[in-house]
Amino acid sequence: DVFKPGDHGSTFGGSCLAIAACAATLSALVRGDYAEHAAKVGAYMEQALAKLPHVEEVRGRGLMLGCDLDDAAGDAHDVVARALGAGAVINATGAHTLRFLPPLVCEEVDVDGLIEILSDVLA
């Protein structure tokens, strides 16, 4: 009778499954060359974003990118909503700024899909 119901355990405490998932993730990060991959795919994405209509500037590093839209594009939050409706999850950090943070395993084909959606949304 040391513990009463609710005294021991939690939904937020560490678990063996969470530790195993974390260890596997860290192991994959150590083995992989994600920095080089992010630089390569990020450069591809930066060039593709710069060619879109209404994009004034693209900046960032690797796969962490942002772009500024001209006034004709409308509010960036509306662009985000339309992109989400078409299947792309992006973020607006201001009235004219979009932010992109794709996963490190993102490939050029994934960038192509995003660019296709944004091309339609910004047309």
Enumerate the predicted regions with their spans.
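Conserved N-terminal phosphate-binding loop of PLP-dependent enzymes in the Aspartate aminotransferase
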Residues: D1-A123
